[in-house]
C-alpha cells in the first residue's frame, strides 16, 4: 500500500510539474491575445500550441520544427539551404547567411550551382488552418530575404476537359512577410522594388497545373497602393501577422495594425484556400535581386543573420469551450 501511495505521489508531482512548465511555456502567447484582432461574436482566441514557440531553449525544438525543410530541400540559386545555418540562442531563432566554400551542386557535393547558403525552417506538423499566425522578426542587413509564410504540397484532382478526363495539380502559398534588409537592384520598369525593405510585402499564390501543361502562378493582387512600414525591416524587431479568416479571405497586420486584405483567386475553385498548410521560416535569394551578397557583405555575423524572437499561432473556438 505504501508503494502505491509513493507511486501516486510521484505521478502527481510529475503531472503538476508538466502543467506548470506547459503553462509557463505559453503564458506570453496567451497574454498576447489582447493584441489580436477582435474575435467574432461567440468565439475567442486560444493558443495553437503546435505552431507556437518562444525560442527560449538552447536548440531548435525538433518536435515542432525541421532545421531543414523536407518540403523544399534546395533554395533558389545561387543560395541553397543548410541546417547548420539555423540555431536558437538568447531567446531567438537565428538563420545566418553564409558563403559556401567550396561551391555546391544540387546534390550538396562540389559544383557550381550554389555559392551561398541561407536556411529553411519548417513546421513538423502540416495542419495549420484558419487562424492567426504571427512572428516578431528582425531582417538581416543583406540582399537575401527574411520571410515567414505558409504553404502546402500539391494535390491531384481529375477533371473533364474537352470531353476527356485529365489530371490537375494545385497547391497554395500564403506569404505573410517577404522582405530584404538592403535593396541594390532597381528595375526602372518595376520601381516598386526600390523601397522593398520598407514595404509590407504579402501575397497569396494558387499554383495550378494541368496534365501536359506548365505550372502557373496565380497571385492575388492586394491593392495598387503600397503599404509602408515604420522603418526598414533590418533596423529593428517588428511583428508580422495574418488572420486567415476563411477559404477566400486573409487579413494582414504589421505591429498589430491592420494593413490590408487579400482575396485569393477563384479562377479554378470557389474555395481556393481551404486546405491546411505548414509553416516556413526562410532566408533565400530572389531572381530579381541580381546583386547577391559577397563574402565581404557577409563578414559581419550579426548583420548577416535574420532574428525571429517568436512564432505564435492562434485559433478560434466557441466561448463555451
Swiss-Prot record:
Substrate binds at residues 72, 76, 173, 178, 284. Its EC number is 3.2.1.178. One of its GO terms (biological process) is carbohydrate metabolic process. Residues 1-20 form the signal peptide. Keywords: Glycosidase, Hydrolase, Signal. Coiled coil: none annotated. Transmembrane segments: none annotated. Gene3D superfamilies: 2.60.120.200. It comes from the Bacteria. It is an enzyme of class 3 (hydrolase). The keyword Cytoplasm does not apply. This is Beta-porphyranase B. It comes from Phocaeicola plebeius (strain DSM 17135 / JCM 12973 / CCUG 54634 / M2) (Bacteroides plebeius).
Amino acid at each position: 500500500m505504501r508503494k502505491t501511495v509513493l507511486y501516486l505521489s510521484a505521478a502527481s508531482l510529475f503531472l503538476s510539474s508538466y502543467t506548470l512548465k506547459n503553462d509557463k511555456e505559453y503564458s506570453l502567447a496567451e497574454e498576447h491575445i489582447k493584441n489580436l484582432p477582435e474575435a467574432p461574436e461567440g468565439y475567442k482566441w486560444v493558443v495553437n500550441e503546435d505552431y507556437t514557440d518562444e525560442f527560449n531553449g538552447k536548440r531548435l525544438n525538433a518536435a515542432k520544427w525541421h532545421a531543414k525543410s523536407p518540403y523544399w530541400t534546395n533554395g533558389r540559386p545561387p543560395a541553397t539551404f543548410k541546417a547548420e545555418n539555423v540555431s536558437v540562442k538568447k531567446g531567438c531563432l537565428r538563420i545566418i547567411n553564409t558563403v559556401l566554400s567550396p561551391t555546391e551542386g544540387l546534390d550538396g557535393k562540389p559544383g557550381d550551382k550554389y555559392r551561398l547558403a541561407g536556411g529553411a525552417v519548417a513546421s513538423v506538423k502540416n495542419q495549420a488552418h484558419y487562424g492567426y499566425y504571427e512572428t516578431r522578426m528582425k531582417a538581416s542587413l543583406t540582399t537575401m530575404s527574411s520571410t515567414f509564410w505558409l504553404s502546402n504540397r500539391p494535390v491531384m484532382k481529375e477533371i473533364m476537359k474537352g470531353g476527356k478526363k485529365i489530371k490537375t495539380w494545385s497547391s497554395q502559398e500564403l506569404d505573410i512577410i517577404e522582405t530584404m534588409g538592403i535593396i541594390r537592384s532597381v528595375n526602372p520598369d518595376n520601381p516598386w522594388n526600390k523601397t522593398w525593405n520598407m514595404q509590407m510585402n504579402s501575397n497569396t499564390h494558387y499554383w495550378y497545373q494541368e496534365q501536359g501543361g506548365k505550372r502557373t502562378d496565380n497571385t492575388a493582387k492586394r491593392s495598387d497602393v503600397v503599404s509602408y512600414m515604420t522603418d526598414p525591416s533590418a533596423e529593428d524587431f517588428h511583428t508580422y501577422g495574418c488572420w486567415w479568416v476563411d477559404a477566400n479571405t486573409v487579413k494582414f497586420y504589421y505591429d498589430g495594425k491592420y494593413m490590408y486584405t487579400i482575396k485569393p483567386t477563384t479562377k479554378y475553385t470557389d474555395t481556393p484556400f481551404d486546405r491546411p498548410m505548414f509553416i516556413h521560416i526562410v532566408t533565400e535569394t530572389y531572381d530579381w535581386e541580381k546583386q547577391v551578397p559577397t563574402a565581404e557583405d557577409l563578414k559581419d555575423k550579426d548583420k548577416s543573420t535574420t532574428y525571429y524572437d517568436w512564432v505564435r499561432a492562434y485559433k478560434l473556438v466557441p466561448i463555451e469551450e
